Amino acid sequence: MTEIKFHRVLLKLSGEALAGPGGSGIDLTTVKRVANELAEIKRAYPQVQIAIVNGGGNLWRGEPAAKAGMDRARADYIGMLGTVMNALSLADALEQAGVVTRVLTAIEMRQIAEPYIRGRAIRHLEKGRIVIFGAGTGSPYFSTDTTAALRAAEINADAILMGKNGVDGVYDSDPRKNNEAIKFAELTYDEVLRKDLKVMDSTAGAMAKDTDMPLVVFNLNEAGNIQKAIEGQDIGTVIKGSK
């Protein structure tokens, strides 16, 4: 069996990654595909512990709503509810694939999910359950990228795996718009900031750098890439605190 590099990971999924070809809403076929891939990983490597933070941009974006005149905090809270909708959809697909799953939310909604408690989250992971963190950090103005950096540090993850929608790593410009865009195999967080590469927002990047958390950016749309990232195969771009 292939050796694995990361034993406890935080998988960051954008909301758009669950939207499928339509680009918005929840595409159940796409959700099922992601869930089945995660289930295969758990069967192949039962010792691997997987936590997930998903975005909500397929359902709502707080910042544009605020620019349109809505109260920013309220707009962000709506976005947090969107992440819970995505989390519940993914949890259902995982359960149907035979994986025991727990959804923990930063805002209490006990009828549908457990409240986020760090020790409880770690205990679920140790028992082999996939843990999905919903509702962001529970506070407005913080992105789900920041949530991923925060939760990864809290659960002592070995790495953040950032699945991108159709982009296989970090480039010096948008490869979908520039055919001559150059892909980076490895970067430091300082280089990401200096080159103004749009990997994650500055708050998330600063937290990941401060906690020296490795980040693997890869194409989620290519089947098997989550497992390859866990195994440490040479896919995507690896970002570290230092060379």
UniProtKB/Swiss-Prot annotation:
It is found in: Cytoplasm. Catalyzes the reversible phosphorylation of UMP to UDP. Its EC number is 2.7.4.22. The gene is pyrH. The keyword Kinase applies. Allosterically activated by GTP. Inhibited by UTP. GO terms for molecular function: ATP binding; UMP kinase activity. ATP binds at K12, L13, S14, G15, G57, R61, N165, Y171, D174. It comes from Oenococcus oeni (strain ATCC BAA-331 / PSU-1). GO terms for cellular component: cytoplasm. Its main location: cytoplasm. It is an enzyme of class 2 (transferase). Keywords: Allosteric enzyme, ATP-binding, Cytoplasm, Kinase, Nucleotide-binding, Pyrimidine biosynthesis, Transferase. Homohexamer. Pathway: Pyrimidine metabolism; CTP biosynthesis via de novo pathway; UDP from UMP (UMPK route): step 1/1. This is Uridylate kinase. UMP binds at G56, D76, T137, G138, S139, P140, Y141, F142, S143, T144.
